[in-house]
């Protein structure tokens, strides 16, 4: 049985004895299908009442966070989406405050947001609003107040709009069915003791709306002199796990039947079979609607019962439709209903770099280095969307007849928003960075390593760490490996290119380039500092070597002469 994210929620805000309400509350659970509909966002803010822009700051923060968060790229992780939105909000609020000479007109607000996707909660917090959780009989405040207690009351030490920099507390944890969450402003929790808060929130005989009203009334009975706002979220049901959230797709359609030339599938006529292997089948097809040629790709029938492989295929289609870049193969969104599982891509005429290398085993070094620029541009476009390709190799780099390089095949790709709590496997072990074999965190530097292996192979026909590399699975095994200079296999390779490859191929990701643009820079022009580091000491300082050698010979001759004279 498939379970969905199901919650009950209620919220209430009251101005209390004040002339205006500077608090803001909001929640959003999109309707429909896909990953967005399984994401709940709840936000609460308390505008600084001593600042005239406090109310605007609170309302803007809640409203814009709930709208902008769901408008971020689907490939971003929740953490990235939340931070990007809050950084933009903070810049705007801080900028508004700079328009005034009086600090009392600043736009300052506290902010606390709870985002739930699948079985995981994410919390973004700044200021002294609070998030509480009731789990069973355990009542816990999950946030820390960013405030100092003074004789004039609490003084915020952190708030949205206070500084152009922002310091947001972030945490994530598992959610359980039966959890109840309370978000409150200080007009509630500064006046109601924690035990009373717990008793009201835990009152199962009352509706959530009634509990919110009771919290407001209780704060008044405790002489709260501030605005009073609260939100209660009751977790009714959760997905079985996060796996089924991995794609923003409906239930997967069936695999198409075995296709042959002349067959028709959803108004695509099979013109030719281009490739067939254990993983997929690739066909050249003509669209009966626009009469253009396209590539139609389907999973192999061998994978009909392989859920992970079918998800990888869906992920390839999902990513391809959302990444648009001239150096990445175009994947087209459906223009009509699809009755089978397949994807449609642009028709590229040319060959993979694997085939090209077989035909050009002695290609000029500069020709191969020129391939790096479009590949790096494509990878940077992916990385900006928190997407790792994870299968960079000559087979997945396509050289068109016009001389352009296109990055293809996203079947092994990892996406920030989809990779949360998922362990996605990389592609070919010969090209994969050590992080995959060791099971440690990876980032764009893993793709950098794979690209460097690919360039090394195109230049030399060999692998940089030999054939044993793919079998390494432990740190000890990797430590036994040593990098073989590309110059040993191809004497036409300049030392500075070999040095750049060597750094990108460091087994320790911390020793690789921080950014792919730096790698490209060192591939295209000599980096004297890097080349110097990569040379043996003798090559770095030949004059000093011979000076020291002569000095040692002189000393040895003096010693011999002295010993002879003493006889």
Language-model features: locations:
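PP2C/PPM-type serine/threonine phosphatase catalytic domain
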Residues: 1-295, 301-315, 322, 336-342, ...
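Conserved HxN/HPN-centered segment at the entrance to the catalytic loop
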Residues: 324-332
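AlphaC helix of the protein kinase catalytic domain
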Residues: 353-363
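Conserved alphaE helix
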Residues: 367-378
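Protein kinase catalytic-loop region centered on the HRD/HxD motif
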Residues: 377-387
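Regulatory activation segment
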Residues: 405, 417-426
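C-terminal lobe helix-coil module of Hanks-type protein kinase domains
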Residues: 431-530
